[in-house]
Curated annotation (Swiss-Prot):
Function in brief: Catalyzes the formation of 6,7-dimethyl-8-ribityllumazine by condensation of 5-amino-6-(D-ribitylamino)uracil with 3,4-dihydroxy-2-butanone 4-phosphate. This is the penultimate step in the biosynthesis of riboflavin.
Gene3D superfamilies: Lumazine/riboflavin synthase
Active site: 89 (proton donor)
Gene Ontology biological-process entries: riboflavin biosynthetic process
UniProt keyword annotation of Cell membrane present: no
Name of the protein described by the UniProt record: 6,7-dimethyl-8-ribityllumazine synthase
Gene: ribH
Keywords, ordered alphabetically: Riboflavin biosynthesis, Transferase
Enzyme class: transferase
Family classification: Belongs to the DMRL synthase family.
Cystine residue pairs: none
Length: 157
C-alpha cells in the first residue's frame, strides 16, 4: 500500500493570502497568523503575496482574477471575518463566500483554504483569531501548505 500525505513545509512554495479588511483588527490578526506560519514553515518573502480586499464578499472575485493570470500560486489562504447581525445579510455573504471559494478550488484544482471566521458575535470572532485557541489564519496556512505538498506528490505519481 502506498500512502501519500502532504507536509506543512513552505520552502519553494508560492502562496497567496487574500485578506478582507472589514472588521480590520480581527482580520489583520488572521492575515498575520497566516503570514507568520508561512515563514515559520520555511517560506521566503519572495514566495508570498498578500492581497487585501475591502470585505469577505470580494475574496472569491480577487482570487479568480489572480488565478486568471496563470500558474502563479500553489496555494491560497482566504482570510476574513463575518459577524452575524440582526438581518439575513450575514447568511447571504457567508454562504456565497464559502461557495465561491470552494468552486474556485475545484475549478482550478488548487488548494484554497477557508480561513474566514463566521461568528455569532465579536467575542467569538476574537477567539477564532487566536485569543483563546488556534488562529484560523495560521491553521489555514498549515492546511494550504499540506495540500500543496500533497498535490506535488500526486503529480509525481
Amino acid at each position: 500500500m502506498k500512502l501519500l500525505k502532504g507536509l506543512p513545509v513552505a520552502k519553494d512554495v508560492r502562496v497567496a493570502i487574500v485578506g478582507a479588511c472589514f472588521n480590520a483588527p480581527i482580520a489583520d490578526r488572521l492575515v498575520s497568523g497566516a503570514r507568520e506560519t508561512f515563514f515559520e514553515s520555511g517560506g521566503s518573502p519572495d514566495s508570498l503575496t498578500v492581497v487585501r480586499v475591502p470585505g469577505a464578499f470580494e475574496i472569491p472575485c480577487a482570487i479568480k482574477k489572480m488565478l486568471s493570470k496563470g500558474n502563479l500560486f500553489q496555494a491560497i489562504v482566504a482570510c476574513g471575518v463575518l459577524i452575524q447581525g440582526e438581518t439575513s445579510h450575514y447568511e447571504h455573504i457567508a454562504d456565497n463566500v464559502a461557495a465561491g471559494i470552494a468552486r474556485l478550488s475545484v475549478e482550478f484544482c488548487l488548494p484554497i483554504t477557508f480561513s474566514v471566521i463566521t461568528a455569532p458575535n465579536v467575542e467569538a470572532a476574537w477567539e477564532r483569531a487566536g485569543i483563546k485557541g488556534p488562529n484560523l489564519g495560521a491553521s489555514g496556512m498549515r492546511t494550504a501548505l499540506e495540500m500543496a505538498s500533497l498535490f506535488s506528490l500526486i503529480e509525481k505519481e
